[in-house]
Amino acid sequence: MIRVSNIHLSLDYDDKSVRKAVAKQLRIEEKAIKSVKIFRRSVDARKKDNIYFLTTVDAELNINEEKVCKKCSNTQIARKYEYNQMKFGNAPFPVIVGAGPAGLFAALILARSGANPILIERGRDVDRRTADVNRFWTSGKLDITSNVQFGEGGAGTFSDGKLNSGTKDIRQRKVLEEFVSHGAPDEILYNAKPHIGTDMLKGTIKNIRNEIIELGGRVMFETKLVSMAFSDNKLKAITIETENGNEIIETDNVILAIGHSARDTFEMLYDLKLPIEAKPFSIGARIEHLREKIDKAQYGRFAGNEKLGSANYKLNTHLDNGRGVYTFCMCPGGRVVNASSEENRLCTNGMSEFARNAENSNSALLVGINPDDYESDHPLAGMYLQRKLESKAFVAGGENYNAPIQRVDDFLNNRKSTHLGDVKPSIGPNYEFSNLNEIFPEYISSSMAQGIIKMGRMLHGFDDGDAVLTGVESRSSSPVRIMRKTDTLESVLIEGLYPCGEGAGYAGGIISAAVDGIKCAEKIIEKSNR
């Protein structure tokens, strides 16, 4: 198999046109090609009058591929990625805390190794969790144990199911292939910006859970980690809380994949004197535009083409005050969702289903902050800042989980909104007109305002006065890092404890978290064979 990059294909390409383009680039006859398959595909929309797919194609030839590869640029012999699944040795079963991407993939790899892992999750299974979330979005009745942050699949379950990642780790291919084998669409294997969609992601998560159980693993929902026991700096046991009371599980290996919103667990770890440090993260709001306007701005006359789907964007700018402002977790044809998980505190996120065909498109508009901005040097100071702003958002929304919203024009002019334009907020249970400038510290609100203006020059209409801001977006990443060793991935203090994934500060998104879960599982398997 030969891999050919930099192949330009029209939006209506078919197998015949792919073969023709590959033959031309390889300078061979079409009949020398046995088969072709898209390996990677992205949209090149830099010229609005000539939008095309930029692709990498795997081609099987019936002539000597090595010779062809040597004489042509942008080619290489394609090597199929094969994951080496190790077997578990003679050791007690491990426990994984948290059933987000990191925890699920750690449990899957451990189950396949024969480790019979226990996976505990403080929230509910994805079906009951979905019912709880939908009830909250319609009635405003929050369940602090089952919500957008807690439950099977983690916080990413109620997002766009975005699978793009900055990590170059080869295991990311493994993650994508596992998603497909458990029910995700094949296109995530080749799209440069793959996504599953919230609707499809739920079924995929259940299928992963079922395989873990079939292989001898145990999955416990509504089960919360409340304490751990150590001896001679080694993990000996954990205490869990269930509906039947507390229970002690003796184990010497625990993967701590708790997610970025397990604040009570962060406090428990701090009380146990585990080394934790405050880390930089970002705060801002969701910004919502009409999908058709974003599509037009990105795709010009090609807007609405079903091959392109709803348009994406990713913007960032550096301000004179030294801060970075950027968009994050863009949800084309999606909705803004109420992602609250604590009583009397409110935060937001974005979500799309696979079709991405809702009326609006949205993204997080975030300002980078660092520990120098926090109100103290406490390791959990970033978390306390999150809580403070979420409490102010809750009050601004009317103290009933309605979200505070504001038109961009009003935000830029520091006045409370009193009416809507052509963009209707999509968040539930409802919204309240507000002035977000009164929620954020000045350094955040002024940076957001400057960012909106500068990004309006990058993407036509981004600074539309009728665009809607919904606050606050405070959970884009973890505010802490649980310190671990670079070689064993264990806590720098406690042997057998593996801080893992986004909540521990070692990932940012579904793919990188899943990869980190796999890496932690591998370390436990390696140790079991010593």
Regions found by a protein language model. Give the residues of each.
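Residues forming the flavin
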Residues: 1-53, 57-158, 162-530
